[in-house]
Amino acid sequence: MNLVTQPLDENFSRCWHKMSQITDPGPSRALYFIDEHEKSIQQGAFGINAPNRLTLFDTSLSTWISFPGLRHAGAATVSFPDGHTESWRWRDPATLAAAKKSVWLVLQPGSGPADLDLQRIQAAV
């Protein structure tokens, strides 16, 4: 359900292969799908650094690897393995400012360890 490119990948064991494996967070809190910003789409996955689990491209935890969509009145649609969906409105000034940039929105800095939007996504992976 979550992305790892191949079984030999070092993080393959961290992937969910069955619904029963989704335990931390559980199916009602684990992010399954997110609406990605059109200036961030570069492959078939949404990348995010996860505290105590994974950091990508030698970046800090306060870095947006991929960037969430804001096309729904400043919010993105997210879905969860238990089948429910939510609309997550972004509030952090750094998130809103980055979304207005005319450049490619990959590897954008967040506002730091207190970035509430980034923390919200990180808590759901």
Language model region names:
Residues 1-125:
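Short, well-structured segments within or immediately adjacent to enzyme catalytic domains
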